[in-house]
From Swiss-Prot:
Name of the molecule in the record: U1 small nuclear ribonucleoprotein C
Family designation: Belongs to the U1 small nuclear ribonucleoprotein C family.
Entry keyword annotation includes Nucleotide-binding: no
UniProt KW Ligase keyword: no
Name of the coding gene: SNRPC
GO molecular function terms listed in the Swiss-Prot or TrEMBL record: mRNA binding; pre-mRNA 5'-splice site binding; U1 snRNA binding; zinc ion binding
Organism: Plasmodium berghei (strain Anka)
Length: 197
């Protein structure tokens, strides 16, 4: 069985198995040799980090691997979002130029997969499933919903005074007497509820 040759490290591996290759590829020496190999290759071509995108020309604008931060959302490109969440990158055919910015998909340092910018909603609203009730049928009013209470047995006289336009000049004597009765009943109940010593 032929031995595996690593062209970055310029050695033959003693164990030519998938496990041995993976272990070698994850090693410190292999990674440093790979970095050095590509640095030498770029140096020979005269490419520096400053002119790297200019060297690619139009190829960089059509290749998400060569230019991932600038071109995540260009039409026709398959990016990391499409694999796990195909609806996130859905574009309408009649979108305007500000469509990307209106839904929060910016081409900046926050546009990488899985990163949530500070202060943003981690789970954005789903525009395709806004209807919370089936067929838009409203909830029925029953004992378990928040139906407003209209007929209460006891009304606060201050609230009545503010809300009742007919009795703005003088307080309704019935409400005032109810307040006195309720106050007396409360004292009476409190006196009866006191425990003897």
């Amino acid at each position: 069985m032929p031995k595996y040759y690593c062209e970055y490290c310029d050695i033959y591996l003693t164990h030519s198995s998938p496990v041995g290759r993976r272990q070698h590829n994850q090693g410190r020496k292999h990674i440093s040799a790979k970095i050095e190999y590509f640095q030498n290759l770029l140096r020979e071509e005269g490419i520096t980090p400053q002119n790297f995108l200019g060297f690619l020309g139009n190829q960089g604008y059509n290749n998400t691997l060569a230019n991932p931060m600038m071109n995540n959302f260009m039409p026709g490109n398959y990016n990391a979002y499409m694999k796990y969440n195909p609806m996130r990158n859905y574009h309408h055919s009649n979108r305007n130029s500000n469509y990307q910015h209106s839904i929060g998909m910016h081409n900046n340092k926050y546009s990488r997969a899985g990163y949530v910018p500070p202060g943003s909603n981690k789970y954005p609203n789903n525009h395709f499933h806004n209807n919370k009730r089936i067929n838009n049928i409203p909830k029925p009013y029953n004992n378990y919903t928040n139906k407003p209470i209209t007929n209460s047995s006891y009304k606060n006289d201050k609230q009545d005074y503010r809300n009742n336009n007919e009795s703005n000049d003088n307080m309704n004597s019935n409400n005032f007497s109810n307040y006195q009765v309720n106050k007396e009943n409360a004292n009476f109940v409190n006196k009866n509820n006191e425990q003897p010593n």
